[in-house]
């Protein structure tokens, strides 16, 4: 079927200015017949159509193009192919033989380009208390329960959030060589602010590093050491709430006329007297009706958002916790104002900073180009991947918005889910979003697949070849397990590596290296070429190269004739070997393969 996506092969300028002209291209297989084709786009809310013309043609395909003028900040468009007795639409969700809503139309946003460095980044998520413990003795706060390093975390108990294992930022610094050797070039930290919990999402200050982690001094040393290794650091900010131990709340409770009083929502019907996130007294909800709060958080010259992006503190960007709920409570909806305000503040002090938000569900309304650069792509990536390879029927679906255990789907359902969710956002937002297999809030992938190493490798291969910014939760690369978010926050056993899956670690290193070296995986589009129940294959195509990716979740016997796609195999890159024009995969277990392809046809026009 005809193909178009937002990558460089199909869109001449992904970040145009209003008034610029952009060339849109469609690749059409010779087997597909039509009389005429048009692009339909919206100018000032009104649909307009422009006919495509033949640009070039080869043995297996032809390329059709149209030049359009960008009239609005956001331009939605789709293509239609007309024949004698039919018409068919092509939008970001796929091909349709009937009229469909414009929610999944392709989109071009006329704003400056997103930070270029994120495309070639692979991030490593670190939960500071559980990654590495230095020899420096740190204070144990009164709220904490000290634990031995290699104990398992307690799950579902009152002490779960107060167990401290002793990981700190100095420990991270001491293991940066490991991080570098793994191949990642970014570290995403869950919060490092002072708090009354091990997860630190209940900040008692946003302007300093928790002394339990080594304080500001440890952070400065870590930033310097990371910079030498060309590793960027991503902070984690809770703009939705603070902790009950924050001085803002104490001042607000003492003085009803204080400016801090406006920072919160008040509720006399609950014992603690204020609205907490999900009713939790430990997490007072922030009220952005307060101009003073906005100044503190992001608008002011020395605001929290800006402080940590300064050269002194060295963060490369922010991950916004529960970004979808920030600025929202009942009838109050200041979400877009706050989101845009945070983005504006970041652009003022560090234009190349990355802004990515947590959003466990529908992300389209937040990723229109003007707020978050991207989101943690749970619904458009992690959830369909889990559903496709899940062997563990005991894992609940609550975190992913399901009132039942994770279901089982086939390959077609996986691809259609991905197209549905990812097709609702601009391509530039998709590639700026974080793709992940798990996190500190979920079960770990090794547990999802019931310890099946080959199946885990299938998931990891998909993670490191799919559009977006891959994020690996520390420990996944050595096969750490965990049946829930709380259980997944296990420590890294640095002293005894006999429990490490070293063979899997080697595979992950190789895949990360491939991801960072190959332009097709950095700048390429996404074209599905094989979709079966148990196996999938797709092309990542850029101006410089083409890579074919194959994965299976079990036994398969299939062939991919790349000559029908206009290619031949140039070299095998990873996993299954292949050459010539036909790649054969006959296996009784989960399998992976990557091949560099080269064109077998001459395009003329």
List each language-model region with its residue ranges.
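Active-site and adjacent substrate-binding regions of carbohydrate-active enzymes
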Residues: 2-14, 18-22, 26, 36-38, ...
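Short amphipathic
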Residues: 64-67
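Conserved aromatic beta-strand anchor motif in extracellular beta-sandwich/beta-rich domains
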Residues: 39-43
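Exposed beta-strand face motif in extracellular beta-rich ectodomains
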Residues: 73-77
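Short glycine/proline-centered coil/turn motifs in the loop regions
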Residues: 29-31
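Short, solvent-exposed loop/linker segments at beta-strand-coil boundaries, enriched for Pro/Gly
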Residues: 45-47
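Extracellular recognition modules
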Residues: 78-82
């Amino acid at each position: 079927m005809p193909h178009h996506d937002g990558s460089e092969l199909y869109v001449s300028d992904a970040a145009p200015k209003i008034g610029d002209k952009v060339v849109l291209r469609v690749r059409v297989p010779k087997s597909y017949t039509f009389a005429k084709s048009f692009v339909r786009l919206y100018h000032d809310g009104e649909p307009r159509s422009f006919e495509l013309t033949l640009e070039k043609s080869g043995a297996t395909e032809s390329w059709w193009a149209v030049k359009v003028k960008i009239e609005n900040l956001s331009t939605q468009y789709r293509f239609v192919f007309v024949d004698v007795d039919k018409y068919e639409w092509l939008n970001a969700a796929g091909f349709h033989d009937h009229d469909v809503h414009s929610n999944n139309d392709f989109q071009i946003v006329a704003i400056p380009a997103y930070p270029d460095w994120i495309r070639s980044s692979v991030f490593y998520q670190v939960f500071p208390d559980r990654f590495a413990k230095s020899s420096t003795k740190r204070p144990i706060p009164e709220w904490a329960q000290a634990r031995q390093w290699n104990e398992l975390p307690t799950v579902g108990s009152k002490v779960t959030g107060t167990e401290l294992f002793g990981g700190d930022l100095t420990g991270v610094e001491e293991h940066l060589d490991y991080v570098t050797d793994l191949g990642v070039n970014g570290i995403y930290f869950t919060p490092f602010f002072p708090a009354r919990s091990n997860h630190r999402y209940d900040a008692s200050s946003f302007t300093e590093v928790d002394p339990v982690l080594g304080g500001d001094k440890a952070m400065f040393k870590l930033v310097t050491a990371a910079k030498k290794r060309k590793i960027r650091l991503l902070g984690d900010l809770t703009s939705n709430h603070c902790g009950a131990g924050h001085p803002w709340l104490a001042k607000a409770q003492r003085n009803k006329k204080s400016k801090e009083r406006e920072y919160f929502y008040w509720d006399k019907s609950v014992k603690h007297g204020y609205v907490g996130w999900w009713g939790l007294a430990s997490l007072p909800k922030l009220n952005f009706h307060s101009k003073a709060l906005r100044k503190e958080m992001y608008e002011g010259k020395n605001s929290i958002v800006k402080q940590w992006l300064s050269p002194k503190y060295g963060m490369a960007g922010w991950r916004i916790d529960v970004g979808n709920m920030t600025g929202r409570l009942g009838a109050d909806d200041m979400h877009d104002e706050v989101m845009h305000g945070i983005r504006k503040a970041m652009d003022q002090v560090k234009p190349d900073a990355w802004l990515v938000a947590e959003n466990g569900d529908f992300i389209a309304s937040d990723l229109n180009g003007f707020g978050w650069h991207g989101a943690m792509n749970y619904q458009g990536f992690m959830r369909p991947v889990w559903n496709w390879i899940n062997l563990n029927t005991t894992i609940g679906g609550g975190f992913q918005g399901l009132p039942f255990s994770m279901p089982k789907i086939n390959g077609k359902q996986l691809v259609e889910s991905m197209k549905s969710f990812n097709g609702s956002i601009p391509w530039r937002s998709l590639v700026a979003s974080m793709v992940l297999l798990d996190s500190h809030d979920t079960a770990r992938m090794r547990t999802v697949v019931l310890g099946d190493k080959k199946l885990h490798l299938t998931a990891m291969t998909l993670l490191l070849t799919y559009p977006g910014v891959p994020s690996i939760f520390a420990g996944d690369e050595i096969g750490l397990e965990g049946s829930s978010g709380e259980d997944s926050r296990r420590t890294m056993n640095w002293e005894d590596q006999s429990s490490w899956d070293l063979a899997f670690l080697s595979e992950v290193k190789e895949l990360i290296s491939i991801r960072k070296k190959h332009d097709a995986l950095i700048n390429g589009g996404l074209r599905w070429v094989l979709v079966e129940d148990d196996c999938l294959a797709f092309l990542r195509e850029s101006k410089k190269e083409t890579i074919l990716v194959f994965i299976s979740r079990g036994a398969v016997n299939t062939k991919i004739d790349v000559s029908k796609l206009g290619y031949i195999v140039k070299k095998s890159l990873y996993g299954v070997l292949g050459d010539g024009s036909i790649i054969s995969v006959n296996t009784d277990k989960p399998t992976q393969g990557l091949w560099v392809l080269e064109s077998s046809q001459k395009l003329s026009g």
